[in-house]
Amino acid sequence: MSRVALIGENSIGYISTLIDIWNNGDCAVLLDWRIPFATSLDMMIEASAQTCFIEQSLFDKVDVEIPNSINFITYDKQNNAAEQLPKFIYDKFKENYSHAEAVVIYSSGTTGKSKGIILSHFAINTNADAIIDYMRPTAEDCIYIAKTLSHSSTLTGELLVALKTKMSLVIAPTIVPPRYTLNNIAKYNVTIVCLNPTLLSMLSNQYERKNYELPSLKTIYVSGSILSDKIYDKAHATFPNTPIYNVYGLSEVGPRVTAQRAECCKGNSVGKPIKGVEVTIVNEQGNCVVDGEYGIVHVKTHSMFNGYIIGHPKHVSLCEGWHNTGDVGYIDINGELHIINRVDDVIIIDSHKVYPSEVERRILEQNDVKECAVAKVEHNGNELIGCLYVSREDLNNVIREKLKAKLLTYEIPRVFVKCDALPRTKNGKVSTYGVQTRLRKHLEQNNNIHIKGRS
């Protein structure tokens, strides 16, 4: 078994090459084509990949020295438009439940350096089977892939599901205007689409501008980051006849952990554990908490990853035999999981825990605020809570006054900064590091600023 890198935009050529790597008994190191090529080179070297299949158009743009230790092989994307997966792709796909390495997926790096996550064929195939169990696709269904295939949720929850069930699949480029996606959903009679909250918000906004006819669309699945109540409510109002289900997971566990289903989970939870997965919530001492109490989410599954290329899990398990997800959450009285924040994002102010997502939820109740992100930032030796928000107007004082009636004093951000757009990672997640950098820069440029309130 060798590790073989693969770099390319979504295309039939990409999928065909991926299956060829697997059929040759090798492990595919999936690298996002949008990251700098120098970073991809570092990842290849880290993963000991000696061969790299790369889309010809991307290879033509390489402007750094290429090491002799890696053999680059180009392939043609062939088509820049969305297209249906042809029969020969389904025919050459072979189900594989061995424990040999299947893929190396690099984490999104929302809080730091990306880590190479090793997943076996057994892990991704058993997880895909569990997804099929709740998704229940039929021969009449058609799934639309709008996110990059180098991410575990797209690879396992969309591509593998389609290949295993022979469901029709439309593969589309990733960086396109929302009207392109909506037009293709109509053109190809798409029934299932999987989005992240950012894409869902973009499609909702575009749909409001022009009333598209989407009679075939029967299900929208949302994953990738916490779905705010504001986006959730707007999407349900925009697509009243299309069920919208939250799903949750992380690459280290296959990736899917929980999912909403038609027979349950009506609110903005992330659903219940899927087949073969167990979830428990524990406190910092490793003791299980009661329903409704916040704790650290731990998962037990047969789809567990094989480890990292370099390093160890950042969050040590607090419950023997379970994987620490690094997420704070709780289970409600209906047995549904709710994700609150990453453990790393929780802010400690005067021994009090502040959950950014809860502060953000209150800020987003202000209609003129389109998006916001709350994070901890250091200034003159002190730790403060700061907020970046997107709005047409400067609403600093308005937001602050509104929060006084809804939050405790120490939960209210000390500094508010209006911006045109929130900083995001390559896959659309809000970058905590980017938010902190923007806030820190603002404070440095306004060193004598009077920061109102006390936290």
What are these regions (language model features)?
Residues E83-Y106, K113, R136-C142:
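Conserved pre-ATP/AMP-binding loop-to-beta segment of ANL
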Residues K272-G276, N287-S317, H352-V354:
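Conserved ATP/PPi-binding loop(s) of AMP-dependent carboxylate-activating enzymes
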Residues T191-L195, Q206-K266:
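Gly/Ser/Thr-rich phosphate-binding loop
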Residues V193, T301, V328-E411, T437:
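AMP-binding/adenylate-forming catalytic core of the ANL superfamily
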Residues A102-D129:
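Conserved AMP-binding A3 loop
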Residues N125-C142, S152-T191:
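Conserved AMP-binding/adenylation subdomain of ANL enzymes
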Residues L407-V430, K452-R454:
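AMP-binding/adenylate-forming catalytic domain of the ANL superfamily
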Residues M1-I35, T148, K353:
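Conserved AMP-binding/adenylate-forming
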